[in-house]
């Protein structure tokens, strides 16, 4: 049985695709759950929805999953500028959920993450993470009494959600893949050392990675003042053990890195996008140095059985465009795809 930790309310009001973070005219309820996955694995799941509303149709429920390094709660529910991505959607009438897979944030961390990395093998593979998503989807569908929900993944999360959707089309309404992972033109060096159970990142390294590929004259105004520190403070706080190190670090499972070596860097797809048979949106930004545009383009061409598909490329954005100055462009495209009526081919001949 899932355990409900607590529930709180916060205020938000919307106007079109805009928002007012300080307004209290409309309420948002937030609940946190512990959801079982594989034996011994407990997942942290968070939900936000309009206060007092308990019934949602399949088309108004969305689940987020994070990428390879940072947890979902500080990716999708960090109130930069006064409102998080979850807040913005909940204020529009959505029942929005996130899940942190094993090894991240408040979900169960494998025991080897409490030892030096070299003493263990890479933990949290894409297959394991997909089972965690499956557990979260089943929990949400049972709780809401629906057969399908919408899914969105970021970075490695696109592989998790893509793999899940390709094998569970009947449970997916629409699919959003933000910075999709696909076959890389890079390869694994022949002298690459074996991977440990997990890796660590520092605050300085995180900022350097964020800005990689950004023109020097564009760096200063890419991330609004205070947003990086707000995000970094919240993100590194999700790993109390790492925070005790000097300097403080964030621990991240290496299963994703091992899968990259075994599949994406070896020219072998981990799954086939052609098996996805639900409407799909790809979101990507031009300065994404982690998963460059060529991967999105190649992935888009593989979506041969989606009823309809769309690819939106954002200018002046990185792998983390969702937390940058152009985040409302991102939100506009996300909400537009999720809320539009299913496009149909017109029978009228063009004039």
Question: What do these predicted regions represent?
Answer:
Residues 289-295:
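Conserved alpha/beta-hydrolase "acid-adjacent" motif
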Residues 147-185:
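Conserved hydrolase catalytic core segment
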Residues 317-328:
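Catalytic histidine-centered segment of alpha/beta-hydrolase-like enzymes
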Residues 186-281:
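Alpha/beta-hydrolase
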Residues 52-98:
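Short, surface-exposed "cap/lid" segments of acyl-processing enzymes
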Residues 72-75, 100-123, 319-320:
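Glycine-rich "HGGG/HGxG" loop immediately N-terminal to the catalytic nucleophile
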Residues 128-148:
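Conserved acidic catalytic loop of the alpha/beta-hydrolase fold
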Residues 26-57:
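N-terminal cap/lid segment of alpha/beta-hydrolase-fold proteins
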């Amino acid at each position: 049985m899932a355990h409900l930790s607590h529930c709180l309310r916060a205020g938000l009001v919307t106007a079109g695709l805009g928002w007012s973070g300080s307004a209290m005219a409309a309420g948002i309820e937030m609940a946190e759950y512990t959801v079982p996955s594989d034996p011994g694995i407990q997942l942290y799941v968070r939900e936000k929805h309009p206060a007092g509303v308990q019934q949602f149709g399949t088309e108004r429920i969305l689940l987020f999953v994070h990428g390879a390094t940072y947890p979902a709660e500080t990716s999708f529910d960090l109130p930069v500028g006064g409102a998080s991505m979850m807040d913005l959607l909940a204020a529009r009438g959505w029942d929005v959920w996130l899940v942190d897979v094993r090894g991240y944030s408040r979900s169960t961390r494998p025991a080897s993450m409490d030892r030096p990395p070299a003493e263990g093998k890479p933990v949290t593979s894409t297959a394991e993470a997909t089972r965690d998503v499956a557990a979260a989807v089943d929990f949400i569908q049972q709780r809401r009494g629906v057969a399908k929900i919408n899914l969105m993944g970021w970075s490695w999360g696109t592989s998790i959600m893509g793999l899940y959707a390709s094998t569970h089309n009947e449970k997916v309404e629409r699919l959003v893949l933000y910075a999709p992972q696909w076959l890389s033109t890079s390869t694994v060096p022949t002298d690459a050392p074996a991977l440990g159970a997990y890796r660590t990142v520092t605050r300085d390294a995180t900022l350097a990675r964020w800005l990689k590929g950004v023109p020097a004259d564009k760096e200063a105004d890419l991330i609004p003042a205070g947003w990086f520190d707000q995000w970094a403070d919240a993100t590194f706080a999700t790993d109390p053990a790492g925070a005790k190190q000097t300097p403080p670090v964030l621990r991240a499972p290496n299963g994703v890195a091992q899968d990259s070596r075994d599949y994406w860097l070896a020219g072998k797809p981990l799954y086939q996008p052609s098996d996805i048979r639900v409407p799909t949106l790809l979101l990507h930004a031009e300065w994404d140095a982690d998963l460059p545009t060529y991967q999105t383009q190649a992935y888009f061409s593989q979506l041969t059985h989606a009823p309809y598909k769309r690819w939106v490329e954002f200018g002046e954005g990185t792998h983390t465009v969702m937390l940058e100055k152009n985040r409302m462009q991102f939100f506009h495209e996300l909400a537009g795809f999720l809320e539009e009526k299913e496009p149909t081919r017109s029978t009228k001949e063009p004039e």
